[in-house]
Structure formats: structure tokens, C-alpha cells
Amino acid sequence: MDFYQKLFLGNLIFTVIGFLVPLCFYQKLNGGKNIAVLSGVSASLCGLIGAGAVLINNEIFSYSGWIIISILNIGVKIDNLAAFFLLIVNFLSLINFIFSQGYLKGQNYKNVVMLSLLNLFSLSLSGVILADNSLLFLLFWEMMALISFVLIMFEHQSTNAKLNSYIYLVITHLGTAFITCAFLLLYLKTGSINFADYKNLGQTLDGLTLNILFICALIGFGAKLGIFPLHVWLPRAYGLGPINVIALMASVMIKTAVYGLCRFYFDFLGNSFLWWGFFLVASGIISALYGILLAVLQNNIKRFLAYSSAENMGIILISMGLALIFKHFDQTALAALAFFTVLFHSFNHALFKGLLFICGGVIFTQLKSLELSKLRGLNKKMPYTAICFLAGVMSLASLPPFAGFVSEWLLLQNLFQLLFYLTNPVLRLLVIITLALVLLVGGLAVIGAIKNFGVAFLGKTVAEATEITEKNQWFKVSQGLLVASLLLLGLFPQHFMAVVNNLVANYFVPLSHNSLFLTIPQQAGTLKDLNLALIFG
């Protein structure tokens, strides 16, 4: 058994222990909650180390076996793309288990059940990314959907709560139906369920089939992303679920959909039509603008963060669309930069969204509310949480020195490069409009950040906050790790690029943080030799 097998087997074993032991032996175990948390932390560390090693060493780990009948093939593979998203899953799961240790007080059965399910939920998230065939992928995808549905309803049994939970379940299964259709079409064309047989099918499939696959993947994974108009489950689910559950859903679960889109568009389909890229850009800007407009209007921190997720997933879609556009024009260096933006913002969003929900959880444990009308002057009683929340909303609003600023800069740079490359005046006008709308989205995000931080933490302290304390060290550790990560990612993006450079190079060309200059071709109007450098070049 090699190094990777030991680590990922350890991840599986610790997860199973964290799920089954506290649940089955609750009455005989006084510390069932502690066992669930410790197992979750151990499993996350194993997955984190394994995924990091695969990514840095540019290696591939794979395993295949058979269970019950031959069609149920356990095909597991970790390439650079899977390793990157496994890093997100395991790092945020690690933070979440640390936070949950402080958030769920007592050894009562309800807390033990929730933590046991969180272990299983974390396994399903990893399973989606580890799967190397369509059947196993759909199995873990459905497992992820059902467990998240149960966890969302965990604290609420009212008719309205059930209705909102079922809305989430319906939309997520609508997405599953389209993903299943895409995999069925791939099976009909290849006669295989293995992902290895789907690689670069864009070179052999006809145009109609490719377009159907593109649309099915976008709707299927878009439902989980929460892009417009499939975003309606976000405020409903986020408003219902326990904070520790929603923190994991918002930071990690929707990234499995980003992974799915990357796997389909860059791995399976390979070649792309020009309209795909522009359609993704248009879908992304609509989602981003609609999401941030609704986010700014909210007077509840949970709902603000829910709608801002639609905005941030829109940003990722725009970057993905730009990568496809540049790839269509065979501008691999520009496509590489756009793809890097997808990866960077995926990690950035996972960090700050997890941080903000955890900060919200800290507030909720003290005041039992996240309505802005009931929150005032919390910085006087919760200075540590105030600093952490400020760091989170600064990254959300793309303000330096945090990672969000780098994400915004990279996106704007991608759009400027597309503007200089295009010669069609209509397309250039559309890019200019997109640039303006992206800047508008950024401005509205700043307004939302100021509103939520200003109302909750500044001003006169509300009477209910007079007894607030910040003595929970589990909260401080989880918040501090995420703030430090956002700051390091914002100050040293070149190190992040060094880690994911092999992944970018697998699809396009390597990026250099020392001397990368992108030359706009002669066809780009009067600008023949305009050199644009990365901000860390």
C-alpha cells in the first residue's frame, strides 16, 4: 500500500468511525460528540495532506475495484483538478469540525446525530470529486443532496420550513436529472461509464451532441451553483439550516458544481464553440448583478450571504466563459489566466464565505438572531469577531489586502485582454458593457459589506448584547485560520499560482509569476504590441 492509498484509506476509515461509532454506541459513550469531531478532523487532515501531495508533486492516484455486480465499479482517481477541489473540501471541513466543537454544546443525542451526519456529508463531498465514473459520481451526488436536505431540516419542523426544504430538494434533483442526461448521452456515444473514455470528446462528437452536453451540464451544475434563475433555494436553505451546516454548504458544496463544470468543459468536451463562452459570460453577469442587488437589500446576515453566493458563482462563470473564448481563439496563455481566475476565486470564496458564516454563528450563539435590526455595536463586546467579520466582508467586497482583491483584479484583467483581442465592434461593445457591469457589481458588494458590518458592529450597543462574551477558543481558532488564509492568499498569490500551475498547464500552458507578459496580437485594432502583466509579475 503506497503513501496515497494509506492517506485516502485513512480518510475513509476516520469518516466511517465518525459517522457510525457515536451514532451506534451513543448510550455507552460519554463523549460521542468528541469522537465525531476528532474523527472528522483526522479524516480531513488525511485528505488535505493527500490532495496537497498530488497537486504539488503533479502525480495521479487511482484505484478501481468491483462490488456486487460488474456495473458498480469503484473507480477512484485523483488528478490535479480533483486534488485542488479536494483541498477546498478537506480544509473547510477541518475548520468546520473545529467550529462545530464549540458551536454544538453538550453531549446530547441531537448534537451527536448532527456531527455524525456531517462526517457522512463530508465523505459525500469528497466522493463526488474522487469518482472516476458516472455511476459513482451520481451515487455520491445524490448522497450529498439527501444528507444536506436532512441537515437543513434538522432544527425546523414547521410547515414553512418543510416547504422551503422541499424547494431545495426539487431544484437539486432538477439539476441531477440534467447531469444524468449528460452522462447517459456520453454513455450512448462511448459505450463506457469511465471518465477516462470521455476525455477530449469534443474532437470526435458532432456539434448537436456537444451543444446538448454543454446545456445539460450548465443547467445540472448551475442548479447546485445557485445561478439565476435557479438561485431560489439559496436564501431558503441558508435561512433554515444550522450555521455549521450552512457554512459547509456555502463554502464547499457549491464548489462541487464548479468542479463538475470544469470536468465537463475542459476535460470531457475539450473543443468549444464560441457561443459557449459568451453564453457563460452573459449568464454569469446576470447572476452576479441579480444576486448582489438582492443581497444589498437584505436585513439578515444569512440572507445577505445567501444572495452574495449567487453573485460570486456568477463571477466564476464569467471567468470560465472567458477561458472558453480564449481557448476557441487558440490564445492559450490568456485562457490559462482565465482558468487560473476560476481556481483562485473558487478558493477565495470558500474561505471568506466559510469565515462569514462562522462569524454569524458566533453572533447567533450570543443573541439568537442574525437580523440586523437586533444587532448593534457588537465590536465593543466582540472585538475578535468584529475583526474577523471585517476581513471576510473586505474579501467579499474585493478590497485589499485580502484575496478578494486579487480575484477582482484578475477578472478585470481578463476582460481587458478580451477587449483588446476582439476586432468585431459589436462583441467589443458587449465586453465594455460587461466590464461596466462587473464594476457595478463590485461597487454594490462594497455597499453590502459596509451595511452589514456597520449596522452589526458599529454604533450604540443593543441592550441584549450587554452580557456577550468571547471566551470560546474553538470559535477563535476556526476564525483565525480563515482570516490568516485570506490574508496570505491576498498578499502572496504567486505561491498559490505555483501550487496550481501544473493543473493550469494540463489544460493550457504554464503561468509564470516572474516574467509573464501577454502580447495582444496585431489584429487587435490599433493596439499591436500592448503588453499586460499579471499583478504579481
For the regions a protein language model found, what residue spans apply to each?
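Transmembrane helix-loop-helix hairpins at membrane boundaries of multipass inner-membrane proteins
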Residues: 1-9, 18-116, 192-203, 502, ...
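Membrane-entry segments of alpha-helical transmembrane domains in multi-pass membrane proteins
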Residues: 2-10, 74-88, 127-139, 275-276, ...
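Hydrophobic alpha-helical membrane-insertion segments
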Residues: 38-52, 173-183, 389-401, 478-500
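Membrane-interfacial helical/loop segments at transmembrane boundaries in membrane proteins
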Residues: 61-70, 196-201, 410-425, 496-527
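Hydrophobic alpha-helical transmembrane segments
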Residues: 76-90, 207-222, 425-442, 518-537
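Hydrophobic transmembrane alpha-helices and their helix-loop junctions in integral membrane proteins
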Residues: 95-112, 118-137, 147-470
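Short phosphate-coordinating micro-motif centered on Lys-Gly-acidic
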Residues: 142
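Cytoplasmic/organellar membrane-interface segments at the starts of transmembrane helices
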Residues: 377-387, 441-537
